[in-house]
Amino acid sequence: MIFDSYANSALQFANRIAMAPMTRCRADHGDAVPNELILEYYRQRASAGLIISEGVPVSDRARGYLNTPALWNEAQAAGWKPVTEAVHAEGGRMFAQLWHCGRISHAALHADGSAPAGASIKRAATQTMVPGADGKPVATDCGQPQALSIQEIRGVVAEFAHAAKLAMQAGFDGVEIHGANGYLLDQFRCPALNDRNDAYGGSLANRYRLLLEVVDAVAAEVAPERIAVRQSPYGVANDMVADPEPLVTYPWLARELNRRGIGFLHIYCQSTDWIHDATHSMMPALRDAFHGAIIACGGFKTPAACEAILARGHADLIAIGKPFISNP
């Protein structure tokens, strides 16, 4: 089944294999414009039914790592254009993953020296890379975040929408909103991090308010069936705390996305066993709640494991990462 084609109302993929988004850090940090190395990297992997790009920051303050190609200005969009053209020439399809790192960042990564943005002021007990005195990358603790104001939150929503518009201009077939892995949108979802007492904190609906505002703003620029949203149930990457009620949280979001006609729900579980663990028990609930395509990602070590999830109807596409970058 994994080599069967897949289509929705807007897109057709040659097979059900998606190349998972993987940060590669191959751009120049100054302008964050994709280069020839990035073009060749994606062109070589265009046999995937769908390529989901590495995370592309939607603004300078959205950056959390050195040398990531971005998508907040015309020059960056122009840099992505030959990349998407190369993928299309090989028969592939490509989504841009829109990314705001939030507190997983450092002031040294931002041109204006601004502090990392966060749902709250709770600092991440993890590290990132910043330029050293000699210009070479050095590891350092993530910086102290500042809790976003309501006005700044509105700005973040606008940044995602603008990046989505640029993605279409650059020739991407769609976009993925990165709401997983402990980055900004996931930070707002997490009750252990989000201690806000305004419209963006407290209840589940409030904690997902930012993500859904981003979804709605992006859907004004990109057809909903060309939009994916990534989530990471049970995820604890980047100093996150596991959701206390995952079987409530994620089906709730799936229903909201379904109501909006979103095309893809991307579920990532790091190094998991999709056949036997808790993620497996969640998939029927997600399928009931969401009628678009479900992408399953994480821990697929064999073709048989991929086929099993497809055969059970728990997913429509399988996203894999390491096999696309391992040595032959």
Model-based region annotation:
Residues 1-328:
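Flavin-dependent oxidoreductase catalytic cores
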